[in-house]
Swiss-Prot record:
This enzyme's EC code(s): 2.5.1.6
Bound cofactor: record note: Binds 2 divalent ions per subunit.
Source organism: Clostridium acetobutylicum (strain ATCC 824 / DSM 792 / JCM 1419 / IAM 19013 / LMG 5710 / NBRC 13948 / NRRL B-527 / VKM B-1787 / 2291 / W)
NCBIfam families the record matches: metK (TIGR01034)
Record-listed Mg(2+) binding positions: D16
The name this protein goes by in its record: S-adenosylmethionine synthase
Length: 391
């Protein structure tokens, strides 16, 4: 049976991604000085202005406007003619402390208050909610091929812009890849969409030629491309006005780009700007860690795990696994293995993945999972042998 599946990615200069990177740059700056800092930082951008708001509790000082300007500069908005400029944009901040009602549940979990467990691991979940992790053996990243290729294209767009290969490109851009599957295996690229901001002096034909040769064919294996692959390069014909001048941006609006490109489910919680006591982030990272190790251990060809939490309670209220018919053992047995091999209390996740570190800005663009360019604790295959002992 043949089917098509499509996923998208965006570049670091996309308005929503600017916001994610600013929020995580602020988080990193705080964690560098205060590993126990509590951060829930939201950012919005529009023409000429950045708004930073949220709840932050810390014993350190960070210069938020300076961090904002540095982040925007690194992304590439360095000239007023781009419609957004790191040196001249206004930066407005509105920061409160974390609610004491939330803090009392996170600082000491319900189980600890009842004397049921040690306080080291009894950090309560920072909120209720469900988080999903996913992994598949169809790519070396253990990621679905559509999102893996879309991220490679987006990252390449930034590379050729920054190194001067295509110096007429500007920071904003999006990519989209449609993969054809046969019997659940990826066999070819059916369609590629690239929309990238550019200078007004360059013609559409030149952009199309350059992007196919220096972006698409640079990152996608030739055996996946054929004479029937369709290319849609800046299909409107012109993309000069972009970035925050073209669209306002907001932290947490690219949650599918951040995860699995629509393959598998999503609990709805965004990642950026949140310290690891927020299970929206830490438990989603743990779920990916669990799923990837299970697939690498040969338990299934693809696997999704759901974790659910209650605010102020350490242990997950539920763990669920779906192997989509590819599992080698019963799903109930897989859940038992997960409970034996992984400690999924928030405090244990933070400890085992060493999450109280400034490691988040680097994943705020081009995906939080399946990254081959950076070392991430939740991508390590360090529980495979422990899992195999139960098979």
């Amino acid at each position: 049976m043949r089917k098509l599946f499509t996923s998208e990615s965006v570049t670091e200069g996309h308005p929503d991604k600017i916001c994610d990177q600013i929020s995580d740059a602020i988080l990193d700056a705080i964690l560098e000085k205060d590993p126990n800092g509590r951060v829930a930082c939201e950012t919005t951008v529009t023409t000429g202005i950045v708004n930073v708001m949220g709840e932050i509790s810390t014993n350190c000082y960070v210069d938020i406007p300076k961090i904002v300007r540095k982040t925007v500069r690194e992304i590439g908005y360095t000239r007023a003619k781009y419609g957004f400029d790191c040196d001249t944009c206004a930066v407005v901040t509105s920061i409160d402390e974390q609610s004491a009602d939330i803090a009392m549940g996170v600082d000491e979990a319900l189980e600890s208050k009842k004397g049921e467990m040690d306080k080291i691991d009894a950090v309560g979940a920072g909120d209720q909610g469900m988080m999903f992790g996913y992994a598949t053996n169809e790519t070396k990243e253990f990621m679905p091929m559509p999102i893996a290729l879309a991220h490679r294209l987006s990252r390449r767009l930034a590379e050729v812009r920054k190194d001067g290969t295509l110096d007429y490109l500007r920071p904003d851009g999006k990519t989209q890849v449609t993969i054809e599957y046969e019997d659940d295996k990826p066999v070819r690229v059916d369609a590629i969409v690239i929309s990238t901001q550019h200078g007004p002096e360059i013609g559409h034909e030149q952009i199309e030629k350059d992007l196919i040769e220096k972006v698409v064919k640079y990152v996608i294996s030739p055996e996946l491309l054929d004479e029937n692959t369709k290319y849609y390069i800046n299909p409107t014909g012109r993309f000069v006005v972009g970035g925050p001048q073209g669209d306002s941006g907001l932290t947490g609006r690219k949650i599918i780009v951040d995860t699995y490109g629509g393959y598998g489910r999503h609990g709805g919680g965004a990642f950026s700007g949140k310290d690891p006591t927020k299970v929206d982030r830490s438990a989603a990272y743990a779920a990916r860690w669990v799923a990837k190790n299970l697939v690498a251990a040969g338990i299934a060809d693809k696997l999704e795990i759901q974790l659910a939490y209650a605010i102020g309670v350490a242990k997950p209220v539920s763990i669920s696994v779906d192997t989509f018919g590819t599992g080698k053992i019963e799903e109930s047995k897989i859940v038992e293995i997960v409970e034996k091999v992984f400690d999924l209390r928030p405090g244990a996740i933070i400890r085992d993945l060493n999450l109280k570190r400034p490691i988040y800005r680097q994943v705020a663009a081009y995906g939080h999972f399946g990254r081959l360019d950076v070392e991430l604790p939740w991508e390590q295959l360090d529980r495979v042998e422990a899992i195999k002992k139960y098979l």
